């Protein structure tokens, strides 16, 4: 029988031939992106590939992941739902408001959302939060993974509009979407500075780590609103 270890609420490590990250499957018997299903003592787990998920990489890079079963989450950059599906597993009794701009990705994503009662797909530009303000309630966590040059600004706009006072921001900063020539370290430094000074009261940076070896030229950031 595989060994299973709880890493944080709703996130597990399973040892079966090799160490694998996993979440408890909210949609038993179904896979989302070709991941493996592993049954342990009557419960079904979905393996979570950190090379296909910035959030999965953050787990393995020892970030604190402020998610619980009743979390309300705003996910910016949902794509076709690979990582959103794992957030849905974790926040099984919460809500995952999922914003994606590409209509092709959204078509695939809607099929996933139709099987999971806690996912709310939103076809919109994450840089224009007022366009979906009538749908999204105040949230406990904003997770952002967008490939736009103004990533810090997008995070700040959405936090100002939706993030609870005691909420958190998890952000994957993709250096090459901001500047293809500059040093990633310099880009990361500037983006973190923008977050700290983005708006009143600004963000307090709790953790900032590169996501190697899972994602090249990416920085993971955990932040909360300053007191």
UniProtKB/Swiss-Prot annotation:
Keyword Glycosyltransferase attached: no
Signal peptide location: none
GO molecular-function terms, A-Z: histone H2AQ104 methyltransferase activity; RNA binding; rRNA methyltransferase activity
Residues reported to bind S-adenosyl-L-methionine: 82-83, 100-101, 125-126, 145-148
EC numbers on record: 2.1.1.-
InterPro entries linked: Fibrillarin, Fibrillarin_CS, SAM-dependent_MTases_sf
Domain of life: Archaea
Transmembrane segments: none
Gene3D superfamilies named in the record: Phosphorylase Kinase, domain 1, Vaccinia Virus protein VP39
Subunit details: Interacts with nop5. Component of box C/D small ribonucleoprotein (sRNP) particles that contain rpl7ae, FlpA and nop5, plus a guide RNA.
Family to which the UniProt record says this protein belongs: Belongs to the methyltransferase superfamily. Fibrillarin family.
Name of the protein in question: Fibrillarin-like rRNA/tRNA 2'-O-methyltransferase
Source organism: Methanosarcina acetivorans (strain ATCC 35395 / DSM 2834 / JCM 12185 / C2A)
